[in-house]
Amino acid sequence: MNTNEAKEYLARREIPQLFESLLNGLMCSKPEDPVEYLESCLQKVKELGGCDKVKWDTFVSQEKKTLPPLNGGQSRRSFLRNVMPENSNFPYRRYDRLPPIHQFSIESDTDLSETAELIEEYEVFDPTRPRPKIILVIGGPGSGKGTQSLKIAERYGFQYISVGELLRKKIHSTSSNRKWSLIAKIITTGELAPQETTITEIKQKLMQMPDEVGIVIDGFPRDVAQALSFEDQICTPDLVVFLACTNQRLKERLLKRAEQQGRPDDNLKATQRRLMNFKQNAAPLVKYFQEKGLIMTFDADRDEDEVFYDISMAVDSKLFPNKEAAAGSSDLDPSMMLDTGEVIDTGSDYEDQGDDQLNVFGEDTMGGFMEDLKKCKIIFMIGGPGSGKGTQCGKLAEKYGFTHLSTDELLQNELSSESGRSKLIRDIMERGELVPSGIILELLKEAMVASLSNTKGFLIDGYPREVKQGEEFGRRIGDPHLVICMDCSADTMTNRLLQRSRNSPQADDNTTTIAKRLETYYRASIPVVAYYETKTQLHKINAEGTPEEVFLQLCTAIDSIF
């Protein structure tokens, strides 16, 4: 490699900027173990997304300290004016005043900055008063962030901040300002506004709201670097709401909004660029908040009222958990909570993990898992309690090499874990409410992906329990290749459950609970069976006979399809 190639490599990889940032951090922090310190800094560079995200002060401490009085009446000095040593042998030349340069940066060029807009180290919230609850609402352009943010603010009496609207108003009111004219051009092309400028505007807006109990911030952060900056300069949010939406739906909504509102950043070129930026930045951003246990994901492809119903349940659970429980934890029965047919709409889809929407930006981002799932043989096993579907699924799995998944068991396993999602599920069940179908679908999808490499197909027991669940499964994963309905009379199922209760001391089956479960099953299963009769291969199996007789019928049905 010659000298020119080396220089080109260093410049292209932003190596000088990285070294400058590391050196500034070392000089300011003076760590006892510089090697360990540098390792932690390099790890942060990875989290930020690479060297191009690093600035000169990325590793400079953000601690707020009382500064000594300034001499000579000067109100502002360079932050690092005294960092460089006075030793004349020090290899770097120190300037009292930097020479002019031809290139400029919106954030640092003096021609583009106003004294009043310089970022100051100040407390955004009064430390002597309770800090307001902060909810960040993120999602792709057109995912409904503004709509849902306003609904959240109205329901809980919170204040609402739209970061996009904040910047647009600033641009409109300072149209003659060179800096903001450039920012306007950046936004119009679909790029992100400069990070520090955006943070400054948010801080100034927050300081105008000293008495709010809560604040909903829409459209920020857009990447991990912005998230880190928000936490460093403002606070750690109490909750992050992620509105997951397919690319196609986002495009449709943006085109419709462009016709109705005429926003400058909704032009076709800008829309494509914004979607690309979102797709690149969303996965690491979601992962970052997942690791902190702060994020909850919602399917935003649905009606806005359905989405908000799910969000409000999650906010109640996360931020206002001290509500009177409807049942003791020892009384929880997952199979009852999963039964449908109640008036409550369970067509929700929220979860505190973003795994579903490592494909939310388009299925390609799930690394091919979704395509592999769609190629797998999928069989739904529908039947009432006591119909024998669990027993038969076990035998079929052994014969055909299928993976047997029971929604009841998946829910029980999740409840026994210590995840944030398990706490949310338990809180919902303790209130006597139904577990949202989105959570069940997420548990199913995670289990299916985990078994992809060593299975020939999936037998899903006890799913779907309503038409909406089946529709959602078809849209998110794919339609089943076969739906089996275990046709069994109420008397037979009741007798089997009572026998099971006598054989298993832990079983809580009694005549009253059995009757209720059967009633719920019949009410919910009729439309499900009708739905699949018109849509796919549905086989009704006479489940009144012996296990061997029923198994033979099932094998015949499966062999006829596969």
UniProtKB/Swiss-Prot annotation:
Enzyme Commission identifier(s): 2.7.4.3, 2.7.4.6
Cytoplasm as UniProt keyword: yes
Name under which the protein is recorded: Adenylate kinase isoenzyme 5
Protein keywords: ATP-binding, Cytoplasm, Kinase, Nucleotide-binding, Transferase
Chain spans, region LID 2: 499-509
Annotated Pfam families: ADK
Binding of AMP 2, residues: 407, 433-435, 462-465, 469, 517
Catalytic activity reported: AMP + ATP = 2 ADP; a 2'-deoxyribonucleoside 5'-diphosphate + ATP = a 2'-deoxyribonucleoside 5'-triphosphate + ADP; a ribonucleoside 5'-diphosphate + ATP = a ribonucleoside 5'-triphosphate + ADP
Residues annotated as binding AMP 1: 168, 191-193, 219-222, 226, 263, 274
HAMAP family found in the cross-reference section: Adenylate_kinase_Adk
Encoding gene (name): Ak5
